[in-house]
């Protein structure tokens, strides 16, 4: 084999894996601007419409650790294709949905598919590229796709809903997924260390996945029922009980689904805290900003989607610079700068008025937050995998994505609760509906800005600059084939 062959093969495989990842990120937000149309056609009640978003986030966040560990134990390409098949089939089912229950079920299965697929894809990337400049380049592109995918989803959702119909936001995944399934066996290497014992931690998987699903469910339903409602408290108590049981199980079993020793990697722990807070601030910023544009400024689905183009283009434009800065100086400063920008963008957006204008009131905060995603997603992706052993690659990538999805669910739930509560207070005080809605969104944006800024002390306390700088300094490219157990 020539020295060029593995390089070309790796980047072909990376392109396919990146497309699969991009689909999962886009589907987090692509339905946001389509919700009114979906609600009308499928006869959702106003309170139940949130489950079109929540069902996906719930299963996505809940099953990520399970998907990551399954990839390490059962073969990463095999699990990737299983998840991709589920995601594609569920996308088709969602497009063909004729009722509310069918749509929610399809979105839940779509989330499971994404949770199985995503850790496998990222761990394959990690094992194709050795630590150093080339892995940083790959993860820089990966992080850039994550940063731009959320805003691209809103834009694509607006365009498709306006000109084709909401069904096409789901049809879009079907041909892409089908082509990826055909190409994956040909260009994506299978990997699994032969030394890994294939014992599956069933008790830990059930307790951990069940606890995460209940946690996301409790957070998601809290805006509807209230944080003090018996139903919310009961679900939260169940989540806590299962998660405590999960920790006890993981301390005792021989082959845990989440070896707790992985948190001794301080950089990994810091990156996951930053990922949690990034999801809690930026994903919720998109949610609140879209509601403000549609409910207060009366933007159409297309207008609301296109408005986010400013953030998306900024993120894409700065992704290369972010990757270069990380390679030269490590992740800590770049990550902290990115989270500062996201927090600052949300706080700037608190100044939006009732009769707002895009250029005067929205473009600036969106550009600042978009820049923040480029400088946050990329170093977080790199730091979360720095120093991780190959046999734990799926686990580490699943852990990072779990942090981001749980953060998004928590942030949206908190923002919804704060906005709804403050809006009701203003309405009872005699304010007109547009002013009350705007006041509620402003209050929520203050909270989201604070969530973003909370990441800064965690980054400086936990992320070790020397660990990542050492990895960045290694420029040798590893041929992955000897380390991979090829399977037919």
Give residue spans per PLM region.
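C-terminal membrane-cytosol helix-exit motif in multi-pass small-molecule transporters
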Residues: 122, 174-193, 209-221, 238-253, ...
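Transmembrane-helix bundle of Major Facilitator Superfamily
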Residues: 1-186, 321-322, 329, 333-335, ...
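Intrinsic disorder in cytosolic terminal tails and internal cytosolic loops
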Residues: 1-9, 194-197, 462-488
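Interfacial helix-cap and linker-helix signal at transmembrane-aqueous boundaries
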Residues: 38-39, 70-71, 156-164, 219, ...
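Flexible interhelical linker loops that connect adjacent transmembrane helices
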Residues: 3-6, 181-209, 251-266, 327-328, ...
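12-transmembrane solute porter fold
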Residues: 11-33, 46, 228-242, 248-426, ...
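Peri-membrane helix termini and adjoining interfacial loops of integral membrane proteins
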Residues: 180, 421-432
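Membrane-interface helix caps and helix-loop-helix hairpins in membrane proteins
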Residues: 100-101, 165, 191-197, 222-228, ...
